[in-house]
Amino acid sequence: MTLFLIDTSAWLFNFPPRVVPEIRERIVELAKKDLAGITSPILFELLQGARSGQEYHRLLQHLLSLHQFPVTASDWLKAAQWAQRLRVRGLKAKTVDFLIAYKAMRHRLVLLHADGDFDRMARLVPLKVESCLKFVRAP
């Protein structure tokens, strides 16, 4: 059973007004099969975007039903060291993306995303990814 960490970049296409049916179906499929996971930075990014208190609580309830991969102090330090090595090799990405990728690698999760930075990381390190970019980029 392979678990997935669903990045914010994929989640955004699960919610109106930006729904992409293929991405939404994949997220729903993973959740129904109990294969979907989340980590605290993604939880934060999604919850802070709620448009009302009611939406916040509904979203929180749903997200907390997923497999949880909290970030520890040790994770921050190890992810920073890992990111530094990748930056020296020329890879540029947002700090939080390095942390999320590190969590996925550490727990051997497949990272479902719509962010090209993760594909670039996966070319350099043993990060397993499933890209949704083909569904959101114009041909």
List where the protein language model places each region.
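Short, well-structured N-terminal submotif of metal-dependent ribonuclease cores
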Residues: 1-38, 48-61, 136-139
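A generic structural signal for short hydrophobic patches within well-formed alpha-helices
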Residues: 11-12, 43-46, 118
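Short, hinge-like loop/turn segments at secondary-structure boundaries
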Residues: 53-57, 86-87, 128-132
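A general structural signal for well-ordered alpha-helical segments in protein cores
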Residues: 24, 39, 43, 56-59, ...
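Active-site neighborhoods of divalent-metal-dependent phosphate/nucleic-acid chemistry enzymes
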Residues: 67-114
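Acidic, PIN/NYN-like endoribonuclease modules and their adjacent C-terminal/linker elements
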Residues: 2-3, 101, 105-139
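Structured helix-beta-strand junction loops
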Residues: 32-34, 62-66, 89, 107, ...
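A short acidic, often aromatic-flanked loop/helix-cap motif at beta-alpha or helix-coil junctions
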Residues: 45, 74-78, 134-139
